[in-house]
Amino acid sequence: MKKLALLLSLALSFSAIADDHAPTSSYLVESIPFTLKDGKTMADMMAMKDEFAAVAQASGLQYSAFVMTPHYMSQSSAPIAGSFDAVWLGFSPSATAIGAGYEGYMENGQELEAKFDELRTMNQRSLMRGEMVHEGDPSDGGFGMFRTCTLNDGADMEELRAALKARGAAFEKAGATASTHMWYGGIGIPNEMQGSVIIVRIFPSMEAWGQAFDRYFAGDFAKEERLLNETATCGPVRTYFGTPFYSASAG
């Protein structure tokens, strides 16, 4: 089964920009934190996959989705208002694609949306631009590390991109397999997220994350960490497991 790394690679395959000073791949990411209603479980949520796929295909939805369940994290570290059980993430190649897809979904998916409403509640929906700044290994499985950062005075996005590329290359040289992304410029984000950047590292599996974690503390990445710290101030790391919900076909 395809999981987080493969789904994200598929979403990214829609759009690539070949410029040393621009993102390797760009996309839009929709984030919907949700809480399951009393008596409902994540199994009930995942049981909706086939119905969602049918509506998405009928609507021409260029949109790959999966459910992120928190693992190592504290509520205060997440840029989410209120408590939540999981986060729905959806990837689309452009605003045009997501807008056209939503029009189709609103026409074809009202009954399905009513079923979702019986399962979960949500009080936040945001849309951010995403960039892949370092490409790692796609494979089965998915474990994500997230940090919320703000640019330091005098720093810009190009410098942050360069710092993340340098870190990704150094980690890869040490044997890490993660892809590195940054998300920013959100619509619908909380006030405290204004001007922030979410740095995301996607590992093929939790074991791959554990191997990278051990190698990080066994190695010397002082140069790369200094470059990042000179560019941005970041909060604590939080992690999630990713489970696929729907995979759009590229092209």
Language model: regions and residue ranges:
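Gram-negative bacterial Sec-dependent N-terminal signal peptides
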Residues: 1-18
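Short S/T/G/P-rich N-terminal loop/turn motif that feeds into the first structured element of a domain
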Residues: 18-251
